Amino acid sequence: MSCKVLEELEEVIRRRIEEGNPESYTYRLYSSGIPHIARKVGEEAVEAAVAAIAEGRERLAEEAADLLYHLLVLLNAAGLSLRDVCNVLEKRRK
């Protein structure tokens, strides 16, 4: 399974965190800590669920993109990567 844009997004997230620019939303989110990031992931998951029920496919895709972005930031903050998640999925597939 491969999704190049997610790998590229993960790299952008890493770079923005390393740069430490306080004007960067990614850096500010990362700096807020895991509990705050986890709440954002929860909020985005709820928004995606609502979009699936009541707002249509296009809106669901947009909310899913937001959810994936925030999840990648959370994974980074926890010392994990998209590769770590893919490894788990590959093991479960067998």
From Swiss-Prot:
Subcellular location: Cytoplasm
A molecular function GO annotation: phosphoribosyl-ATP diphosphatase activity
This protein's record includes keyword Nucleus: no
Predominant location: cytoplasm
Pathway participation: Amino-acid biosynthesis; L-histidine biosynthesis; L-histidine from 5-phospho-alpha-D-ribose 1-diphosphate: step 2/9
UniProt-listed PANTHER family: HISTIDINE BIOSYNTHESIS BIFUNCTIONAL PROTEIN, HISTIDINE BIOSYNTHESIS BIFUNCTIONAL PROTEIN HIS7
Protein name per UniProt: Phosphoribosyl-ATP pyrophosphatase
Organism: Pyrobaculum arsenaticum (strain DSM 13514 / JCM 11321 / PZ6)
This protein's encoding gene: hisE
